[in-house]
Each structure stands twice: as structure tokens, then as C-alpha cells.
């Protein structure tokens, strides 16, 4: 469906307003300065192994857990001053736990197979998004009024990974209250992209994306209600998976979902190597993971593949960058050449309304009729009530405790209608039905992860609706795997979303494994020259 003349005019007008506002914003926004333009290269070969490879070596006594954990601690201490990804560590406790693992392995009489079955991640280090409860660690989500809060227990997903033998190294940064695609807050500061320190890492799981992309962690935990796993994975060149809704327990993270949001929020794995996705999801899902048949072999040659290059031209969203369109076309060519399949290119008109659909559904009341907690109410947690307009005035004077993105979201909510548009609801239902019928149990769809390659810090303020490329799949409840596709001409990560039908997670995960081999997967940023 082509854009109308009026819609094209609105698009040009919006872009003009955005750049005028951006010029004004630069006068007020804090400026960053870095004396170093790139990460130091990885020198310890243990940091270049997947979690599954590390677990195997630890079980076989080819390397100790202490050696692996210490290698990651050394790397974090080397690069974290540059990227500001980890906000609180537990290095001493992690080394003690690693020593206990090594002792357990020495004393185990049942053999390697027993350990693999019982403790598949035994001795492997992991990092955790600060929004999740990790015993003894902060759980503030960047809110100053929660700065002294320490978790007394683990979130269920964290507990399952620890029970499988994983050793947490610490917690990582996120956007204020987990509702923005730049990981920045006034408690911990801003997190930098490992490929270019002047670029964003995405959000809200941006600290995880950055620390993984920097080679300072091998596996991590993120959450996703609008792209908060997939966007950071895209910007930082790593893998991530938003599972089918209802598979992984979402409890133990802040802020809690309300209204209908629990049906859109997903907890999932983030990692540098695709082979770690299925084992992590199997562990994190607990008994629910059985619904996914994750270990059933997938024959990619028998799947139906589709490619959607853009959302149809919404005037609210940036056009997809040519390098991203080209990367997706290269995936299509490779699939057709290697697998002998025919990838069908589609345009789906309803995707044009992705942001409106996401916004409408996120604001919808729950089954009990209660509306979701407003963002301003969440910002007021543990302190005085936040008045968005007054907070904006304070921000311009430099006195606000909140980020501009958080204040802006609270302001937008003031003008949000409590009555959903019948037209938007019709588009949502139509899109849901069309995609579910299209994908079925053997379909895979390629879709841009984001219309833009990682932007400079603070720039997303002026393209706030671009996240709708990921957010729409939260509303639809479909599983999506984020897959890296090499680097752009500027040395920044490229990527694509791989979408499958409900409970068909294994199809998108199998496709990601194939694309990792075809396109090289994660690229070490320390070996990438950054343009000034």
C-alpha cells in the first residue's frame, strides 16, 4: 500500500522538526569525551569459546572454573571503564563459587555425563540485567529512589541458570525503568557501544548487549517488552531470543508488568554464540520449555521462508538504511543458494501501524479491568509524586533526577486516549491472523531489526518510534531470534530478525545457527578500526 501525498508530507515535516529540535538539544545534552577510540583486543583464548564449549572443558578438567571466571573478571576490569556496562560486580563471591565447582568436579564419581545432565552450565560465568533480582545485588533499574535496594532472592529465571551451574559475575546497566532504547540513567550513567564509544547500545538490556559484544561475558539474561533483548543484540553484534509468550517466568524483575503487559513481556537469553541459545532457553523455560521441542532436529530445506524488507513506510518511523536492506538481501540469496529454497518477498500493509498497535495494546486494561500502572507512577516509586511537565522544566535547569527519555514518555502518556481506536484494533487482529496463517508450523520470516544502524548517543530521542520494528512481535506473541550479519562500512553491527510461528522457536533458532556459519556471527570489536 503506497503512501498518500499527505502522509509523505507529514513524514518530511516530522523529519524537519526532528532536526531542528536536535540542534537545540545539543546545547543542553551532556557531551562525552574518550581518550581511547577502540577496545583492547582479546588476548585470552578462553574468552573466544562458547558457554557450551567452556562447560565441556570444565567438566573434562581441561580448564578450571576459576581460570575461566578469572579470565572474564580480567576482561571486565580492562574494558568496563570504557563501556560502563557492568554497574555492580560480585567478583570475590564468583571466584569462591568457581573454586567450589572445581572441588565438586574433582570429587564427582559419576563421570562427565552425570555432570552434563545435572549441571549443564557448571562453572560457566554469566551476567544479569540489573532489572532482575540477583541475591545481594542492586535492583534499581536506574531509579535514584531505589538506589539502596538490594535483592534478597533470585528471580526465577536467574535461579534456574544458577541451579544449572552458572556463576553470576554481576549486574549490568539498563535504561531508566526499562522503557527506552538507550541504556542511560542518573544512577549509573550511560553505556557505550563496544564498536564505537559514541554510539548507543540499545535498551533496555543495553548493558548486557555491550558487555557481551565486548567479549566480557559469554551468556546473559535480558527482558523484552518492545525489543529490549533484540535491539541491544542488534546494536552490539550478538545473538538474542525473545521466546514465545509464556515460556520463561517473568517474575522477579522491576518494574513488574501490569494491565495486558504480562502477555507481551518476555525473558530470554543473550549470547555471543548461537549454539548457546537453545541450552539457555531450555534451562530458563523449565518445564514449559518442553512445549517448544527445542532438541527436535530442524531440516531447513523443508521450511518456507519469507522476507519483508520494511514496514510499508510509516511516516512515524525512519526508512530502513540501505546497508541493512542489502544485508537482508544477502541472507535471501544465501538461503536460496545453499538450501535450494525459494524465499518469497512480501509487503504486509498492517505493519505500517506497528507503533500505534503497540501503544494501544500496552495501555489496555487487564482482565480485571484495571489500567496498567503509568510511567509517571513508576517514576514516583519510593519518593515524591512526579509531575512530568515540572520534571521537564527541572531537566532544562539541570536539576531533574530523571532522564529526558523517561520524562518524555511520562508526558506522552498524559495525551494518550483511554479508548482504543477501532481501526487500530482491526489492523492488529488482521495482522495477527495473517502472520499466524502465513507462518504456521513451518514458516520463517526475515524482518529488519531496526531501521537504523546504531545511532550516536541521545539521537533516539528524535526517532522515538523506530523500536516498533521489534515491538510489534511482542504484541503478536511470536518468537523472534536476533542474528548478527557482519559489520557495516563504519564498522558497526548489521543484523536481522528471524520470526517463527507460536511455539515454533526451534525454527528461528535453527536458522540463526545456519546464518552464524554463513555470515560469521559475532565479530570481535577490538579488531575493528573505528572511524573518527
UniProtKB/Swiss-Prot annotation:
Keywords: Hydrolase, Lipid degradation, Lipid metabolism, Membrane, Transmembrane, Transmembrane helix. It comes from the Eukaryota. One of its GO terms (molecular function) is fatty acid amide hydrolase activity. Its main location: membrane. The chain crosses the membrane at residues 9-29. The keyword Acetylation does not apply. It catalyses: N-(5Z,8Z,11Z,14Z-eicosatetraenoyl)-ethanolamine + H2O = ethanolamine + (5Z,8Z,11Z,14Z)-eicosatetraenoate; (9Z)-octadecenamide + H2O = (9Z)-octadecenoate + NH4(+). Its EC number is 3.5.1.99. One of its GO terms (biological process) is lipid catabolic process. The active site is at residues 129, 204, 228. Belongs to the amidase family. This is Fatty-acid amide hydrolase 2-A. It comes from Danio rerio (Zebrafish).
